[in-house]
Amino acid sequence: MRSEALLLYFTLLHFAGAGFPEDSEPISISHGNYTKQYPVFVGHKPGRNTTQRHRLDIQMIMIMNGTLYIAARDHIYTVDIDTSHTEEIYCSKKLTWKSRQADVDTCRMKGKHKDECHNFIKVLLKKNDDALFVCGTNAFNPSCRNYKMDTLEPFGDEFSGMARCPYDAKHANVALFADGKLYSATVTDFLAIDAVIYRSLGESPTLRTVKHDSKWLKEPYFVQAVDYGDYIYFFFREIAVEYNTMGKVVFPRVAQVCKNDMGGSQRVLEKQWTSFLKARLNCSVPGDSHFYFNILQAVTDVIRINGRDVVLATFSTPYNSIPGSAVCAYDMLDIASVFTGRFKEQKSPDSTWTPVPDERVPKPRPGCCAGSSSLERYATSNEFPDDTLNFIKTHPLMDEAVPSIFNRPWFLRTMVRYRLTKIAVDTAAGPYQNHTVVFLGSEKGIILKFLARIGNSGFLNDSLFLEEMSVYNSEKCSYDGVEDKRIMGMQLDRASSSLYVAFSTCVIKVPLGRCERHGKCKKTCIASRDPYCGWIKEGGACSHLSPNSRLTFEQDIERGNTDGLGDCHNSFVALNGHSSSLLPSTTTSDSTAQEGYESRGGMLDWKHLLDSPDSTDPLGAVSSHNHQDKKGVIRESYLKGHDQLVPVTLLAIAVILAFVMGAVFSGITVYCVCDHRRKDVAVVQRKEKELTHSRRGSMSSVTKLSGLFGDTQSKDPKPEAILTPLMHNGKLATPGNTAKMLIKADQHHLDLTALPTPESTPTLQQKRKPSRGSREWERNQNLINACTKDMPPMGSPVIPTDLPLRASPSHIPSVVVLPITQQGYQHEYVDQPKMSEVAQMALEDQAATLEYKTIKEHLSSKSPNHGVNLVENLDSLPPKVPQREASLGPPGASLSQTGLSKRLEMHHSSSYGVDYKRSYPTNSLTRSHQATTLKRNNTNSSNSSHLSRNQSFGRGDNPPPAPQRVDSIQVHSSQPSGQAVTVSRQPSLNAYNSLTRSGLKRTPSLKPDVPPKPSFAPLSTSMKPNDACT
């Protein structure tokens, strides 16, 4: 069972490591408002004018023998670490080394800027106990000197710094002294083409790497040099020669050279390294496809952790990619093991790099130091065989890469916009000096503080993110308004518990721990898990713990257990990435804060606090001694931590119930909204359907007169009405002899854009006329048509047309025949006294009945059998009505506002031609006079008849407008005579001076079909005597 559990654990660990780890959050955060209290060095001496400043251009800092050395441009400053500093750090000594004017002039002649033609100190080493070795760029002419450590006075001769110091301050270089010899790595020419790892000084011969050989070095950037055992290790990054086909791929490298290397023979590798080997450093996130951090930024010296010698290195992504940084740890034994592995070679310039088989490796093995256990018979490297020397010359690259501990980064930082560039380690942190704390510096002036936790195997397997600090002081470090936040170097001094952080314009002294921020809050002090801080029981405050402290204190570095400790109200330390409180901690604001807290039941009055004249910035500086005198600021309940937590089961149930209730509520809301919309749509559709049916029943017979003849409103105050040709005067006769308006004119807006405009057709007044019903009306018309069938037509001019005369059962007749006497005209066009609509309707009904009886008697007297049969047959036959009508008069005709009278004259001649003629009389006669004229015409001719139906559209005084065109219809008769029947319509052009005897009454249609071409014929007023049906 135990073995299965272990197997499951390692499987889960493997899968957990396969994914990309997330960034850890800091326990504590210190912003710039708090760290600006730290002392700053800007190049001043004590007692001097502090307002004057000059550009420092700090290149590096070092701590030697309790003294901080600051290497800058043209100067070296020393600072006594033991001297306490409050606001500003003053230098104790200052060394000035400026370039000679001749070197400056030469530098300017080579095209360099005057700011570059200075002496930038790039090498500052302790040569021995009494001397310093210093090298500078010296206006692109590197030079080196020796100085006394205590007085900073030069001694000895100045010598060339070529291959020891770079020409340009921007170029990277490393150097160290080992066994009295200087090992340096830099460039040796003005153009920085020849990169070299160089050994000089001392009794050993000068050695260097092979010149202009990309297999040895290809555009390297040197980071660190480490002395370990029999070798000197150089850490750098360069363009990977084994990946030339993929472009400029940069790999981190580690190279080794033997300390006792004396160079090769006179034939091979003379005055060159015979032990130079290099290998790749692997710092990547494991997975199916490894994610590599290839830009090496900084490397520590060899440090000892739990009995193992390791180096810590910071890596980052390329500068043209997304920012990301990682810290990897390497065991020195792993590095040495790689250099004893297989070599890598390229057989041809176009081939890939492959491992070299072991049988091809010569003896003695290349890369070993002379006099070692495997090369005891070779006292010096000059005695190596040529095969060994030739092989090491062409095969300096190892096949395998140096793996990091646990094959994964020790720390990752990928969700930020900066890269980690510097590193400093305290391997004896805490009161018992048993913890390892790492400080990482970034290019944005931010320092990250980590606790290195050691696993059971003795290797680094986890890290604890303790603190994040923003230490750059913009007020004191900016120069000419420019803020350069890149960290140039970090030096840790364990004796003073300080970390010196160097920028290009200043140096800031940062305490290793910020214990005073916790004040008298025990919970935050323990939860910070800072090895430098502890809860002092005697003073009841969180204080810094010095090594071998005899004070009684409490710490919990491994777990940070705070069970039973109450919350604090006077701490703004961020725990687990979140600020626990933002209450101020300065002495001047404590009383004000306490008063506001007590008066409001535990809530601090921030407005009162900020408005107080004695208050300071809530995020301002805090002194460590201010918290010792505070009273009544801490509120601790001493409740068990688990009592304040919510059970996971209850939390899960609450979440599920909240989700279900939200889903139900959402469903009900959606249903209600959809149902409401569905009802609205149904109501709209029902209304549209009813409106469609009403329109369909009225459109074929209803005409909007106001839209047809113009937009001018009638003078009659009565509302406008739609007129129908089937009902007299637009009114519907009801059994009660009451007239009703059919349809209001403003209820329908007909599309009459194709009809004449108001400019050509004046406005007509509308009126309605009662009707006796469509069925009775049709019988009367059929009887009248029957009585005129056998009568000879009256001679009149006929206008021919090609349009046939058709009748359709579904077509509402627009041309009907009515017997109209001359009294009808008088009724329509002569001003009469107003009478009620009921009286008018009764009078018209009597006239219609009289006409019907007269026609019937006439038919019976003329031809009894023929007339009766004809009358009976016509009751069931619809009238023959032309399908196209509604000709309009010319625009220039004189119109009247009294009403519109349309009449068609029908003449029977010997050729049986029927002529429909429309005329508009100007004079109206009485009905009795009309009847007399009709009887007189019947005595002259019994075969001709003129019947007129008068449709009045208004009660105005003026005559109706004349039509604009004439439709002529010619019908070929089927009678034996072979004569044609012609129906014509034409306007009256005689200014309405004569009145026709009888005619056909036409009604306007709603919308005429395609009109024929207008044709005009002279109006003939000569008529033959006709016989009217009596």
UniProtKB/Swiss-Prot annotation:
Gene3D superfamilies: ligand-binding face of the semaphorins, domain 2 (3.30.1680.10), YVTN repeat-like/Quinoprotein amine dehydrogenase (2.130.10.10)
Disulfide bonding pattern of the chain: 107-117, 135-144, 258-369, 283-328, 477-506, 515-533, 521-568, 525-542
The keyword Disulfide bond belongs to this UniProt entry's keyword annotation: yes
Molecular functions (GO terms): chemorepellent activity; semaphorin receptor binding
Residues making up the signal peptide according to the UniProt record: 1-18
Chief location of this protein within or outside the cell: membrane
Subcellular location: Cell membrane
Region (Disordered): 754-778, 860-897, 912-1030
Annotated keywords: Cell membrane, Developmental protein, Differentiation, Disulfide bond, Glycoprotein, Membrane, Neurogenesis, Phosphoprotein, Signal, Transmembrane, Transmembrane helix
CDD domains: Sema_6A (cd11266)
Assembly information from the UniProt record: Active as a homodimer or oligomer. The SEMA6A homodimer interacts with a PLXNA2 homodimer, giving rise to a heterotetramer. Interacts with EVL. (Microbial infection) Interacts with P.sordellii toxin TcsL; semaphorins SEMA6A and SEMA6B constitute the major host receptors for TcsL in the vascular endothelium.
Name recorded for this polypeptide: Semaphorin-6A
Species this chain originates from: Homo sapiens
